[in-house]
């Protein structure tokens, strides 16, 4: 690549505007010399936790964020430094660390990225749920808006054993997600998330099955919503969500190279052309990879390895 941004230039971009604006700049400018063979991949951004791998990294300084109590919202402002989160562009491999000192998880907790999406205005949003390995009460799910400044809200309306995940920024500007038990098991609720307070509210009466896990939300340009149902052995079914139907509409069993997909999906997104894309790996295989998904047959085609926890499509 002939036009590569320096660390200083990338850092200036990230601080001057939103994180996604910097990534969009990388996509539109730095990739102009080497467009992807598959245009659907150009705007895919991944997120993971841990140390940065590449040399192109920028650290966003400490910012003020507002946390809201999970049961009684308040206006208490505290200094929180979101760290341990790394953004990465699929097509360039360029990475960006979000902070560098205080972790989102406390000592004795493991940071679980339970949701990642892009809002209609381009702001990236991540849901994190610290998992405790001690007997103390774990920190509830947080949603962090990766803008300038970074803002973090504690999700309110969750029960002690619940977490919010599978975030989706809808075409009409809302933020929705799936609520289930912290171990990923039913019952599952489709909820709307207040962008100002973090409060959740149920938005429809779709009844999800009690013997399958539900994960991921994707909306295509035509407004159709998709998710996946995962059976006991990891068998994964693509389904459509229709507010006029009481149950999810089963479309197809997912498979790759003629083999039944057996490990659920990390992410499901829809490109501007209406192509469903999935992130995941078959059981006992690494790393994760991005796959195209045929909505009718369930056939998945491996496009590119991408060793991240979740993906979204950055919006300009």
What are these regions (language model features)?
Residues 118-121, 170-172, 220-222, 270-273, ...:
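Residue-level detector of Asp-centered blade-edge/turn motifs that repeat once per structural unit
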Residues 96-103, 150-157, 201-207, 248-256, ...:
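Beta-propeller fold detector
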């Amino acid at each position: 690549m002939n036009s590569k941004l320096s660390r200083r230039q990338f850092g200036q971009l990230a601080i001057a505007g939103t994180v996604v604006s910097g990534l969009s700049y990388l996509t539109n400018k730095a990739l102009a010399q080497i467009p992807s063979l598959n245009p659907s991949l150009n705007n895919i951004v991944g997120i993971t936790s841990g140390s940065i791998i590449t040399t192109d990294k920028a650290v966003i300084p400490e910012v003020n964020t507002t946390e809201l109590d999970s049961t009684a919202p308040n206006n208490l402002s505290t200094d929180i430094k979101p760290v341990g989160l790394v953004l990465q562009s699929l097509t360039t491999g360029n990475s960006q660390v979000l902070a560098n000192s205080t972790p989102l998880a406390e000592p004795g907790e493991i940071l679980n990225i339970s949701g990642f999406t892009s809002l209609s205005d381009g702001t990236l949003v991540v849901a994190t749920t610290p998992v405790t390995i001690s007997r103390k009460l774990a920190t509830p799910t947080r949603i962090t808006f990766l803008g300038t400044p970074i803002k973090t809200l504690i999700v309110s309306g969750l029960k002690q054993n619940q977490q919010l995940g599978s975030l989706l920024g809808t075409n009409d500007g809302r933020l929705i997600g799936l609520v289930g038990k912290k171990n990923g098991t039913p019952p599952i609720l489709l909820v709307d998330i207040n962008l100002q307070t973090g409060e959740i509210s149920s938005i429809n009466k779709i009844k999800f099955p009690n013997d399958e896990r539900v994960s991921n939300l994707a909306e295509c340009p035509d407004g159709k919503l998709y998710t996946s149902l995962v059976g006991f052995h990891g068998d994964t079914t693509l389904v459509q969500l229709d507010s006029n139907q009481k149950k999810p509409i089963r479309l197809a069993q997912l498979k790759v190279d003629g083999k039944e997909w057996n490990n659920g999906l990390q992410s499901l997104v829809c490109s501007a052309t209406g192509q469903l894309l999935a992130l995941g790996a078959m059981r006992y295989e690494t790393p994760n990879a991005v796959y195209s998904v045929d909505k009718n047959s369930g056939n998945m085609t491996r496009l590119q390895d991408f060793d991240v926890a979740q993906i979204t499509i950055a919006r300009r």
